[in-house]
Design a protein with these regions (language model features):
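HATPase_c (GHKL) ATP-binding subdomain of two-component histidine kinases
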Residues: 94-95
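Short beta-strand-loop-beta element adjacent to the nucleotide/active-site pocket used for signaling
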Residues: 23-33
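Conserved glycine-/histidine-rich ATP-lid loop and adjacent helix of the Bergerat-fold HATPase_c
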Residues: 69-79
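Glycine-rich GHKL/ HATPase_c ATP-binding element in histidine kinases
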Residues: 89-91
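Acidic ATP/Mg2+-coordinating residue in the GHKL
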Residues: 37
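Conserved ATP-binding N-box helix of the HATPase_c
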Residues: 1-22, 73
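Short conserved segment of the HATPase_c
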Residues: 42-53
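A short beta-strand-to-loop motif within the catalytic HATPase_c
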Residues: 83-87
Length: 182
């Protein structure tokens, strides 16, 4: 799953807060990825075309592949992509996947992804929530910044290392529980 690319869309849209949630409901068999932001949002016209790889709001290149790839990854597993956006309010992208499907791509290294987002965008806030069968873990950069007290930046490599380890340590018990680990 290309979570980093989707989250960077939020940053590029001026989001001050981006929420990334990954939910595994084994009984329903539907992993869900949701990225929601308070960025500038999209017009209804752009929102309707944004999953076209040749539709982009950028001027630097004429293609945008993050959302089209996420949509394709979801649909290959029997899932779907939903996008809600309002100008001046923000955007929410939700992708569902078929858990047991052979084409389900690995989630990837979410701890490094979230730590990297926090480190490279220290002036923005990110909330990462992992939920597995109703049990959740949340990493919130606002709480981390409060603990750091402004004396140490989220851009500090040692902070990024801590964030990655913190997410890994708290995610592992959720991801490895039960009869079939994710």
């Amino acid at each position: 799953m290309n979570v980093l690319d989707i989250a960077q869309n939020s940053v590029a849209a001026g989001a001050r807060l981006t929420r990334i949630s990954l939910t595994f409901d084994r009984a329903a068999g539907l992993p869900t990825l949701c990225v929601a932001d308070d960025g500038k949002g999209m017009s209804p016209e752009l929102a309707a075309r944004v999953t076209d790889p040749f539709c982009t709001s950028r001027k630097s290149r004429k293609v945008g592949l993050g959302l089209p790839f996420l949509k394709m990854a979801a649909e290959l597993t029997g899932g779907a992509l939903a996008l809600e956006s309002a100008e001046g309010v923000g955007t929410t992208v939700t992708a569902t996947f078929g858990l047991g499907h052979i084409d389900l791509a690995p989630v990837g290294d979410m701890a490094s992804t979230i730590a990297g987002l926090m480190q490279c965008n220290p002036d923005r806030d990110f909330v990462y929530t992992l939920t597995v069968d109703g049990e959740s873990f949340c990493a919130d950069s606002r709480e981390m910044k409060e603990i750091l007290g402004g004396e140490v930046s989220m851009a500090d490599p040692q902070v990024a290392l801590f964030v990655r380890q913190y997410i890994d340590e708290n995610s592992a018990p959720l991801l490895n529980k039960g009869e079939s680990a994710l």
